Regions:
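A structural signal for multi-pass alpha-helical bundles of membrane permease subunits
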Residues: 5-270
Length: 270
């Protein structure tokens, strides 16, 4: 009985891994093929191995600038989201005030709202202020979604820190900024890592706002990938290569914060 159960679990695990890995493998496989081979021959690996698709990405400014633009506004958004979320999460975790639960619920409601709901207001506002097609436009728009999520994650980690630590620091003569930066934040560095990861990933993959609020100068890679149709048709090989390179930053970030994410799952905040 135990052996049969183990075999079933192993089978389900193998099937799940195949289901999860197959699309990634197929994209990598396509990235090393020519368009003719992609459209004409079914093969599990490239018959005519080529790096040309990746050469296009690294030499064509319309492609590699998309990665640069994405990194710029993702870095801005992640940093600003954490700077805004840290004091807010501390207030929710340490103080009770009139309407605190309602404010917290309102924050989470913003996070659960589809980006399309806010698209028209952002478009009109940025057009009026002259912020269209700028990195700051996308970064600020994503704050509406990342700050509530970061507050929710950080509040859970901060609530797990005993209040006695705050009181002891104040008795020892620590000012609040010094206590918060040198004592409190190191205690919740796992939460900061988890919050930064989710802020990064949302901004990195979000398409609707990034595509609508930019056109040329600040167009991110996710928007660039939706505009690959030329007179000769869809360039599938280049699109696959762009997809592979788009996965790489997320994979690197996951590698560095994997332990923090596991801790977040254990605390029920991820």
């Amino acid at each position: 009985m135990a052996e049969s159960r183990f075999q079933k679990r192993t089978l389900f695990l193998v099937l799940y891994l195949l289901f999860a890995i197959l699309p990634v493998y197929w994209m990598v496989n396509m990235s090393f093929k020519t368009n003719e081979e992609i459209l004409g021959v079914f093969s599990l690996w490239p018959q005519a191995f080529t790096w040309d698709n990746y050469k296009v990405i690294f030499t064509d400014a319309s492609w590699y600038s998309g990665y640069i633009n994405s990194l710029i506004y993702v870095a801005i958004n992640t940093a600003v989201s954490l700077l805004m979320a840290l004091p807010a999460a501390y207030a929710f975790s340490r103080y009770s005030f009139l309407g605190d639960k309602h404010v917290f619920f309102w924050l989470l409601t913003n996070r659960m709202t589809p980006p399309a709901v806010f698209l028209l207001p952002f478009f009109q506002l940025y057009t009026t202020l002259g912020l269209m097609d700028t990195h700051i436009a996308v970064a600020l728009a994503h704050l509406l979604f990342n700050v509530p999520l970061a507050v929710w994650i950080l509040e859970g980690f901060m609530s797990g820190v005993p209040r006695e630590i705050d009181e002891t620091a104040y008795i020892d003569g620590y000012s609040f900024p010094r206590f918060f930066l040198t004592i409190f934040i190191p205690l919740i560095k796992a939460g900061v890592g988890v919050a930064a990861f989710f802020c990064f990933m949302f901004s990195w993959v979000e398409l609707l706002m990034a595509r609508t609020l930019t056109s040329v100068n600040a167009k991110p890679i996710v928007a660039t990938m939706t505009r690959t149709v030329s007179a000769s048709g869809m360039d599938w090989g280049v699109l696959a290569a762009a997809g592979v390179l788009t996965i790489v930053p997320g994979a690197i970030v996951i590698w560095f914060v994997r332990n923090y994410i596991a801790k977040g799952f254990a605390m029920g905040r991820v």
